[in-house]
């Protein structure tokens, strides 16, 4: 039987060299605004522990947007997820990507800082909340990290920042839960199996074998019942660059558009932001979460004790979809902008997400599904 917090068979993750060097890792730390002054001379002193892993994840999803603009505003209409291209796009240019780019960058950077980690893959659920799941193929990337020295205790990390993204590491344990962006949101892990699976624990048990994990998000509401949704399922197998590249090609070429058309039919852009002190106090009081301060924040849904640090500060989300820009804080959503032209959209991308699309590149979106009125 699999032990709580461990990979199957008690497997250990070995120390694996990063594809980024110390200078690149130091530049990444500076770009995401990790506290301190970093260079190739001192990045080897980074303390690769669980709390710092949490801070790195949160800083990444604040610094970089979950976005697919390269699919539509470039002549090649592709999403380059190679290691050199990701460094240039994120660290040099300050732009973003979707999960393959975000988590590949994060994996290689935390390896450069001394973490033991590998990447796996998941199946996105496209069904709405409170309904049976509708899983795609393996089109999502997740990370497994063993941040404790001399231990094989394992945490799941997703630093992609899209949708109702998880915002801190979560223990690989059935029933583990963590607070989401704010106290009104919770993420949980459940180990289960698909009802259509051919596998079972023992003959004629009629119980599906628990061979996959599911990340579930729960949202409280001010005016209605709590909603629950399976975000994705994943397995513990290690996946590699070629696996992600094949899935990536299927997405940006539209080969899978009949099953998943979100990125082909839309400009998608989302990014987390830090709540102000006033917003923080309001969220903590409103959600009556003060009694959860003593629970473990990585497995029992505890609320980090509010000390004005970035580890304890809640997050909000900005989301650009269709022709609207929305700001989400806890249970509240505010429409900031409504736009109808490409000039308006690229102005919003620049102002709110730091993504600079040259006016000359607008010609590349002409005739594509998400195109708006062009100059």
Per-segment meaning from a language model:
Residues 1-14:
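Intrinsically disordered, low-structural-confidence terminal and linker regions
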Residues 3, 125-307:
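His-Asp-centered catalytic microenvironments across diverse enzyme cores
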Residues 16-94:
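Secondary-structure boundary elements
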Residues 26, 107, 346-347:
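Short glycine-/small-residue-rich flexible loop motifs, especially phosphate/cofactor-binding loops
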Residues 48, 52, 98, 102, ...:
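Short amphipathic alpha-helical segments
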Residues 72-141:
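Active-site neighborhood of thiol-dependent amide/isopeptide-bond enzymes
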Residues 261-268, 274-375:
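Extended, charged low-complexity segments
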